[in-house]
Swiss-Prot record:
<dbReference type="Pfam" id="PF04131">
    <property type="entry name" value="NanE"/>
</dbReference>
<dbReference type="InterPro" id="IPR007260">
    <property type="entry name" value="NanE"/>
</dbReference>
<dbReference type="InterPro" id="IPR013785">
    <property type="entry name" value="Aldolase_TIM"/>
</dbReference>
<comment type="function">
    <text>Converts N-acetylmannosamine-6-phosphate (ManNAc-6-P) to N-acetylglucosamine-6-phosphate (GlcNAc-6-P).</text>
</comment>
<keyword id="KW-0119">Carbohydrate metabolism</keyword>
<dbReference type="GO" id="GO:0005829">
    <property type="term" value="C:cytosol"/>
</dbReference>
<keyword id="KW-0413">Isomerase</keyword>
<comment type="pathway">
    <text>Amino-sugar metabolism; N-acetylneuraminate degradation; D-fructose 6-phosphate from N-acetylneuraminate: step 3/5.</text>
</comment>
<dbReference type="GO" id="GO:0047465">
    <property type="term" value="F:N-acylglucosamine-6-phosphate 2-epimerase activity"/>
</dbReference>
<dbReference type="GO" id="GO:0005975">
    <property type="term" value="P:carbohydrate metabolic process"/>
</dbReference>
<dbReference type="InterPro" id="IPR011060">
    <property type="entry name" value="RibuloseP-bd_barrel"/>
</dbReference>
<dbReference type="GO" id="GO:0006053">
    <property type="term" value="P:N-acetylmannosamine catabolic process"/>
</dbReference>
<dbReference type="GO" id="GO:0019262">
    <property type="term" value="P:N-acetylneuraminate catabolic process"/>
</dbReference>
<protein>
    <recommendedName>
        <fullName>Putative N-acetylmannosamine-6-phosphate 2-epimerase 2</fullName>
        <ecNumber>5.1.3.9</ecNumber>
    </recommendedName>
</protein>
<comment type="similarity">
    <text>Belongs to the NanE family.</text>
</comment>
Length: 229
């Protein structure tokens, strides 16, 4: 059974939750052993996969969890806005560290390495390639280039203003076009995650609402302050 077939089976049985275990940078939780513990807790709670950033975090998580890991490396480049797995060496390192799926930025922006080359390198390692996209055009272009999975990860993050709501119409449009879609980006409630499935998502990635304690506390603090004013 291929990994995609196994994931199809697990998603049908468990509902399609993927947990992104990426603490706020510099947080007290931003340590490989804590990231790995989050990943294990997510697996034990029914997540069908986890998304992990960074080689050290991935290696430790891989030693604890049995579900597939979506691996990424984030970089801040001087000459490109692309942050997610921009280099071929990043793909190689993630493959060596134990990622089953490697995600790359799939947007049509200036970049050090072409999306096509990154996807080909992932497939060279016999792993699944995921493209983090911002639009239907991005997603369809990446699908034509061989991406196995299209994520809506970058929707709302390539323009100055980020909306509060997730991009459900993008999920539907990509699904209707024949893409295997992971809905990601601002799915900060079970209701929104469930809505993504109704719109055609194959699975839904949730990050901040589960693993970023500072964000969750901020939401509660803001609501309480507003109620008290």
């Amino acid at each position: 059974m291929s990994l995609l077939e196994q994931l199809d089976k697990n998603i049908a049985a468990s509902g399609g939750l993927i947990v992104s275990c990426q603490p706020v940078p510099g947080s007290p939780l931003d340590k490989p052993e804590i990231v790995a513990a989050m990943a294990l807790a997510a697996e034990q709670a029914g997540a069908v996969a986890v998304r992990i950033e960074g080689i050290d975090n991935l290696r430790v998580a891989r030693s604890l969890v049995s579900v597939p890991i979506i691996g990424i490396i984030k970089r801040d480049l001087d000459d490109s806005p692309v942050r997610i797995t921009p280099f071929l060496d990043d793909v190689d390192a993630l493959a060596q560290a134990g990622a089953a799926i490697i995600a790359v930025d799939g947007t049509a922006r200036q970049r050090p390495v072409a999306v096509e080359a990154l996807l080909a390198r992932i497939h060279h390692h016999h792993l699944l390639a995921m493209a983090d996209c911002s639009s239907v055009d991005d997603g369809l272009a990446c699908q034509r280039l061989g991406a196995d999975i299209i994520g809506t990860t970058m929707s709302g993050y390539t323009t100055p203003d980020t909306p509060e709501e997730p991009d459900l119409p993008l999920v539907k449009a990509l699904h209707d076009a024949g893409c295997r879609v992971i809905a990601e980006g601002r799915y900060n409630s079970p209701t929104l995650a469930a809505e993504a499935i109704r719109y055609g998502a194959w699975a839904v990635t949730v990050g901040s609402a589960i693993t970023r304690l500072e964000h969750i506390c901020g939401w509660y603090n803001d609501a309480l302050k507003k109620a008290a004013s």
